[in-house]
Swiss-Prot record:
Pfam families: Ribosomal_S16
Gene coding for it: rpsP
Family: Belongs to the bacterial ribosomal protein bS16 family.
UniProt cross-references to Gene3D superfamilies, sorted A to Z: 3.30.1320.10
Gene Ontology MF term list: structural constituent of ribosome
Annotated InterPro entries: Ribosomal_bS16, Ribosomal_bS16_CS, Ribosomal_bS16_dom_sf
GO BP: translation
GO cellular component terms, A-Z: cytoplasm; small ribosomal subunit
Keywords: Ribonucleoprotein, Ribosomal protein
Keyword Ribosomal protein among UniProt keywords: yes
Organism: Azoarcus sp. (strain BH72)
Protein name (Swiss-Prot/TrEMBL): Small ribosomal subunit protein bS16
Length: 83
């Protein structure tokens, strides 16, 4: 099953997350199919904290991908900010 979830990157104490479409059997930070966006919880100033490619996200959802609870919350937050 394909899931859309967060893959952690960044340095110690400086988290950065890629929003990826991946097979559910792969590790959290392991192999993924496609990068759909990113989330930077420590963004400040002019940096963007959340970027999501909504076209690709919709494509994966139409093809049966499940969103993790955190990604679902972030997508809802991004849609609210865009409106």
């Amino acid at each position: 099953m394909v899931v859309i979830r967060l893959a952690r990157g960044g340095a110690k104490k400086r988290p950065f997350f890629n929003i990826v479409a991946a097979d559910s059997r792969n590790r959290r930070d392991g192999r993924f199919i496609e990068r759909v966006g990113y989330y930077n919880p420590v963004a400040s100033g002019a940096e963007k904290g959340l970027v999501v490619n909504t076209e690709r996200l919709a494509y994966w959802e139409q093809n049966g991908a499940q969103l993790s609870p955190t990604v679902a919350r972030l997508v809802k937050q991004a849609a609210k900010a865009a409106a």
